[in-house]
Amino acid sequence: MKYSEIMVRHGELSTKGKNRMRFINRLKANIQDVLSAYSEVTVRSTRDRTHVLLNGADDRSVIEALKPVFGIQGLSPVYKVEKSVPVLIAAVQEIMSSLYREGLTFKISSKRSDHQFELDSRDLNHTLGAAVFEALPHIKAQMKNPDVTLKVEIRDEAAYLSHEDIKGAGGLPVGASGKGMLMLSGGIDSPVAGYLSLKRGVEIEAVHFASPPYTSPGALRKAKDLTQRLTRFGGNIQFIEVPFTEIQEEIKHKAPEAYLMTLTRRFMLRITDAIREKRKALVIINGESLGQVASQTLESMQAINAVTSTPIIRPVVAMDKLEIIDIAQQIDTFDISIQPFEDCCTIFAPDRPKTNPKLANVERYESRFDVDGLVERAVAGIRVTEITPEIETDSLSTLIEELL
């Protein structure tokens, strides 16, 4: 027998009261995005669960695509059959025969929402259990912790059988908590910050600053590859490339070296905030970790934050570097992040950056620039690309094609 669908159990959605269907519909849309490469698959949702109808698609590939999606508590591949006793007996015998090995223990666990069905749950357990013994005389029944629990559910439209419970990613459906702008460099920390925000239902748009010719096409490709990794958790992500060369050259020529990083980060924050307002997001997200680098001391954060009143979420702020690396490895972004392409935060990095910048000094140096004009030109020059969770191609080949 082939699985007919994957039954998705909702996670924290069950606690969301009147907003429950909004959350469920968001999860459905995210699942459709994640499975966009499987044209034959269809998705439908009810208040209790979401049904991913395979229609011939490979069940294992679909399950692997669904496992990282936030908002899913668990998955069960399911056989859908006609709800008649003879059909159920034949299906149960076939399933258990395919699973059987010497010493295997099992139990049948039936329930019915269709109370017009000819057998109640207890009688159905006995009837189907007897059918298993008829097909497999040496198999053993065990009510507590059996090797296989074959679940049989009688619903109005059909009967459903399953024996696998696969843990989902939990969390909230991406987008259920609103939208935020993720300041995505090419490093280890910002993709992890994006992942943790996605887990709590925040839809992210990735803002990446590019400074050609100082930053290479490889650095841009790396940022897009990191973004694609993040699409596995909730579907498509808008990637926003910001032209930053003019601003970095201005800062390099007009400001003291020790203040380069502080001024650079202030411009980045202004630009991200302007894009946030334009694209109707609620917060800014970054990968700052307290004390990790010069721009991430409390004094530096205060001087940089002064340019905006927008809330800034820092999901990794209290984590050690090794904790962040562990998550990066789990979500498969680490190997991309350590590719040796410099981003615009490192190309002009001073040897001795100011770790305790005074706001009065920062504002005095900033008065040398046409701040509003620089920000407006950067925002006007953004390029937006939709990154999708399609089946991945070789990134090296893609990069070579772009260079040619």
UniProtKB/Swiss-Prot annotation:
Q: Which organism is it from?
A: Streptococcus equi subsp. equi (strain 4047)
GO molecular function: any one?
tRNA binding
Subcellular location per the Swiss-Prot or TrEMBL entry: Cytoplasm
Please state the pathway this protein functions in, per its UniProt record: Cofactor biosynthesis; thiamine diphosphate biosynthesis
* Keyword ATP-binding belongs to the record: yes
PANTHER family per the UniProt record, alphabetical: TRNA SULFURTRANSFERASE (PTHR43209:SF1)
Residues bound to ATP: 183-184, 208-209, 265, 287, 296
Query: What family classification does the UniProt entry report for this protein?
Result: Belongs to the ThiI family.
Query: Known Pfam families for this protein?
Result: ThiI, ThiI_fer, THUMP
Keywords on record = ATP-binding, Cytoplasm, Nucleotide-binding, RNA-binding, Thiamine biosynthesis, Transferase, tRNA-binding
Recorded catalytic activity of this chain's protein: [ThiI sulfur-carrier protein]-S-sulfanyl-L-cysteine + a uridine in tRNA + 2 reduced [2Fe-2S]-[ferredoxin] + ATP + H(+) = [ThiI sulfur-carrier protein]-L-cysteine + a 4-thiouridine in tRNA + 2 oxidized [2Fe-2S]-[ferredoxin] + AMP + diphosphate; [ThiS sulfur-carrier protein]-C-terminal Gly-Gly-AMP + S-sulfanyl-L-cysteinyl-[cysteine desulfurase] + AH2 = [ThiS sulfur-carrier protein]-C-terminal-Gly-aminoethanethioate + L-cysteinyl-[cysteine desulfurase] + A + AMP + 2 H(+)
Q: What is this protein called?
A: Probable tRNA sulfurtransferase
Q: What highest taxon heads this organism's lineage?
A: Bacteria
Please tell me where this protein is predominantly located: cytoplasm
Q: What does this protein do?
A: Catalyzes the ATP-dependent transfer of a sulfur to tRNA to produce 4-thiouridine in position 8 of tRNAs, which functions as a near-UV photosensor. Also catalyzes the transfer of sulfur to the sulfur carrier protein ThiS, forming ThiS-thiocarboxylate. This is a step in the synthesis of thiazole, in the thiamine biosynthesis pathway. The sulfur is donated as persulfide by IscS.
Q: Where is the THUMP domain?
A: 60-165
One GO cellular component, as annotated? cytosol
Which GO BP terms, alphabetically? thiamine biosynthetic process; thiamine diphosphate biosynthetic process; thiazole biosynthetic process; tRNA 4-thiouridine biosynthesis
Is GTP-binding one of the keywords UniProt gives this record?
no
Q: Which principal EC class is assigned to this enzyme?
A: transferase
